[in-house]
């Protein structure tokens, strides 16, 4: 199991944790439904970060490459206190430090899927709609310290 670190949030633009906190403070925030971030693997160069935004009824998961660029993002919404649903996944491709292509998948519980491919240079947006089986998009809400189900890259 990879080491886990906590902070108030992850600052994407600067690639740093804001207000690191110890486990007891993070646990208290979790129990109170207050936001906090989970850094997986390292406090300074994590491979993944999880934004526990229970006050907004959502969880964000960002996967970082070796250069700290967020190449994959998942967004889950709380359906109730016990279950999450994956509503959005975004995959980004980079050329040096700039995103050149982003593909976003927007899911709903009824099985509707919207796929948006955004080419950034030159700008072009493609969008298609489809259907999918939503069964695999449900996850149990994580207990404090148990984030393994959220860290699955291949969904």
Locate predicted features:
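A short glycine-rich beta-turn/N-cap micro-motif
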Residues: 43-48, 67-72, 97-101, 110-114
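N-terminal interaction modules that seed assembly of large macromolecular complexes
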Residues: 24-52
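Generic beta-strand structural signal
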Residues: 41-43, 64-66, 91-93, 107
